[in-house]
Amino acid sequence: MADTFETLTATDALARFSEGSLSPETLVEDCLTRIERDNPKVNAFTCINGEEARRLAAESARRWQAGSPCGPLDGIPVTIKDLTLTKGLPTRLGSTTTATDGPWEVDAPISRHLRNAGAIVVGKTTSPEFGWKGVTDNPLHGITRNPWNTELTPGGSSGGAGAAAALNLGLLHQGSDAGGSIRIPCSFTGTFGIKPTFGWVPQWPASTMSTLSHLGPMTRTARDSALMLSVMAQPDARDGYVGNPTGPDWLTPPPASLSGWRIAFSANLGYVEVAPDIAQRVEEAIAYLEALGATVERIDPGFSDPLKTFNTLWFAGATQALEKLNEQQQAALDPGFLEIARRGQDVSLSAYLAARRERSELTAHMAAFHERYDL
């Protein structure tokens, strides 16, 4: 029976590389073949990096055969979002207003970290223009579709990564998230993602969304996201917010028993309307945690809907994209993005600073709240 890699995890692939039952060349070739077959159905990729991926896979195979992998992701096919600089590959931000010929001569920190760990970039994934919304379509690449039902969206803004993860077109996928752009696609495509705490993962160039924007992993399993995050969460001198983090060992398996753990649970944060089927699934997860011995306290965190504060910061960030565009270029933008960017021009400095203060106060409130709980 022929080997199939449509559900293979990065964790299992690395184990098979080590034991010699799988070669990076075989895995990368299979991945590229399936991208060629499946991408026309979902439009998850902005570009394919086939020639370089095959060359790097051959080099990785030789290292594994010699028993000397270059890093914790050696030979693993990965994708990078179109908002993230990737040396040698176009970064167009989903926009016809960006340069068609680069130059793309430098890696963003996470692109460099992944490559230094041995990961092989097989392509870049789609985003709405400048990552502005929770569905994925843009004037440059068109509509990205959900693999579960191509009449539906995979969400956004990391919709290409979500669709690629669902189809395992690459085993690890990079996303970014300011207002749900990892969390929404993962929920729409049945995949797993993390918006890490700001300051764990370096980001450069700086996002127009300032500290709202975080970079993180999107995968098919929690363990693969932990593996990817352990590589992404390394310092880089270009991001002064990231010093030398000494975070948790994300790869250590959780304890078999949660006896003694205190877990805070809010079904709706005190203000959100939750779909009944989703609420039921979450209740099942809570029951499972209780069965493992945890004490679950049902409590709302004690803050009101922060949407107004978020929108002030979001609109002000969006308007920065207009500063370098002439009238003709602005006319070519996604009309929805142009609308919120122009609304951002009406945000006063006082309103912006007030929103920053409100966010800081909420951060402090939640930090104190979490001090009382393990989870």
Q: What label would you give each PLM region?
A:
Residues 60-77, 224, 254-264:
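Immediate post-signal peptide segment of exported/extracytoplasmic ligand-binding proteins
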Residues 74-93, 257-266, 315-369:
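Short helix-loop capping/hinge segments that flank enzyme active sites or metal/cofactor-binding pockets
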Residues 13-19, 98-102, 213-220, 342-347:
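Short, well-ordered beta-strand elements within core beta-sheets of diverse protein domains
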Residues 1-55, 291-292:
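An N-terminal boundary/leader segment
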Residues 53-55, 63-140:
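Acidic/His- and Gly-rich active-site-bordering loop/insert found
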Residues 104-236:
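Short glycine/serine-rich loop segments
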Residues 192-280, 284-285, 328, 361:
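A short helix-breaking turn/cap at a secondary-structure junction
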Residues 24-29, 58, 249, 253, ...:
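Acyltransferase
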